[in-house]
Amino acid sequence: MDAWERNGVDYDVFGSSFYQFWQGNSSKNALAGLQKIENLAKSRGKMYAVMETSWLNSLKDADGTSNVIGEGHANAKVYSDDPQGQVDALTDMYQTLLSNDNGLGAFYWEGAWSPVKAGWTNWKYNKDMSDR
């Protein structure tokens, strides 16, 4: 950011990804990191937004391929691996994000954590599910 300022790069909002799962095995560690990034943006006079975030809803292998995150992974116990865990993770993130006067909000991402059937032939299944 120092180089951007030296070279006159202007931007409206400072944004970053925030995946609590990859921030350590404690929600406090993850949220402290989020607060530091937000404070960095504030020190530069910028608003801050989380550009992508999510939390898993299951550790089960739903598509027959190996998961990056699975049973026994220590960080998976920060929040529960179910829809309530998603609610809890997002609630904590938003409370931290909006506790500072420069937090704007977040974009939810990572559809791979929503189990679907794998493969190129699943278009009909996906279409049928989206029509419900």
Regions found by a protein language model. Give the residues of each.
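Aromatic- and acid-rich polysaccharide-binding/catalytic face
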Residues: M1-K28, R44-S58, N67-I69
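Aromatic-rich peripheral "rim/lid" segments of glycoside hydrolase catalytic domains that contact
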Residues: A32, K36-N39, S58-D92, T96, ...
